[in-house]
Amino acid sequence: MFESKINPLWQSFILAVQEEVKPALGCTEPISLALAAAAAAAELDGTVERIDAWVSPNLMKNGMGVTVPGTGMVGLPIAAALGALGGDAKAGLEVLKDASAKAVADAKAMLAAGHVAVMLQEPCNDILFSRAKVYSGDSWACVTIVGDHTNIVRIETDKGVVFTQADNAQEEEKNSPLGVLSHTSLEEILAFVNAVPFDAIRFILDAARLNGALSQEGLRGSWGLHIGSTLAKQCDRGLLAKDLSTAILIRTSAASDARMGGATLPAMSNSGSGNQGITATVPVMVVAEHVGADDERLARALMLSHLSAIYIHYQLPRLSALCAATTAAMGAAAGMAWLIDGRYDTIAMAISSMIGDVSGMICDGASNSCAMKVSTSASAAWKAVLMALDDTAVTGNEGIVAHNVEQSIANLCSLACRSMQQTDKQIIEIMASKAH
C-alpha cells in the first residue's frame, strides 16, 4: 500500500505521532495510577479489599486536584480505587472507560472506609513513577509503572515475580520512533506534511473527532471552571466579539473544561497529556473551518501541529515545571499558520513569538485551572500567527528568543530541563503544604 512509497524518515514521523497521539480518558497522571491498580487487581482471584500506592512527586502534583471521570471526586486515591475495582488493565490510558456505577460506588466506599493510602515514593529518581499494591485476603499483587504513563516495568505477587522489564532504556530509545526527533528539524517536518500521501495520515482526523466532541460537551455543561460556556455567554451579552479569535478561545477552553471537570469522554492526547492534545487540535480545527478546509487539508494541518508539538516536547522532561500547553500551542501555531499561507517563515516566526510570550508559564499540577492556561496558550498562538502573517515576530535580540527558531526552542527547553527543576520542587512543596 502507501507505506512502500514513503521514505524511512516520513514513516518514522508517522510512527512517532501514532506513539504519542492516543485516546485517553481522564487526566493521564491519576490514570497512570489507576492502570497500575487495575493491572495489579487482574493478578488476584478475589475482590480487592485494600490498596497501598506510591507515586513520584511530579505525579502527586498532577494528581492532587483533578477530577477522575465518572466519580465527581478529585485526587489519586479515587483513581487507584476505581482502577482496582472497575478498571480494564488492557485498555491503557482508557483504563476507566467501562467502569460501572457499582464500581464507582464500591470505590467511594473503599475510600470512606480508609482502605486506600497514596504516599510519596521516597527517594525517587523517576519523574513519572506509580506503584499500586492491592490486597485480597492473604493475597497481594503489586504493579510498578515508570517513565511513561503506561510503561509497566514490574508485576509481583505474594507468589513471586510475574514480570520484570529488563533495564535496557538505551536500547529502547534507539528503537523508539521518537528517536528520529533528536536529529530532524521543523523544515523537514513541514516538507513531510506537504508531500506525504493523505491516506498515510488520515488517522489524525480522529483527534478532531474526539477533541471536537469534548469541546461540544464543554459548551453544553458546567464542567470545571466552565470557561468556554461562560465566555460564550459574554458574547451573547455583547462583551466579547463573535469572531475567529474568540471562537478559538471559547472552543479550546470548553474542551479542557470538560476534560478536567471529569467528563466521561476521551481526549486525543499528545505526549501523554489530554490538554496538550486538545491544545494542538482545537485551534487548528476552528481555523480550518473558517477557511473552508477539506479533510485532507485539515489532516495535514493537524499532523503539522501534533508532530511539531511532539518535536518540541521531546526536548523536555516528561513532566516538569513548564506548562506544556504552551509547547502544544506552538504546534497549533504552526498548524494555523500553515492553513493561512503555508510558508515556513510564517511558522517559524509564530513559534518564536510564542516563546517570547508564554514561555514562563508554570505547571502547578493538573486541575480545573488548566483550562485557563490552555485558553491563554491558544490565544497566544493565534496572536503569534497574526503577527507572523504581517512579517512581525519577537526577534533574536530579545530575551531567550534566538535568531534561529530551532535555537529558540532549545533555549526554552533548557530552562525546563535545568533551572526550572528548582521551581518544580518549590511548587510541589507549596502544594504539599496545602494538603496538610
Curated annotation (Swiss-Prot):
Organism: Salmonella paratyphi B (strain ATCC BAA-1250 / SPB7)
This protein's encoding gene: yhaM
GO molecular function, one term: L-cysteine desulfhydrase activity
Protein name: UPF0597 protein YhaM
GO biological process: L-cysteine catabolic process to pyruvate
InterPro entries, sorted: Ser_deHydtase-like_asu, UPF0597
Family stated for the protein in its record: Belongs to the UPF0597 family.
Cleaved signal peptide residues: none
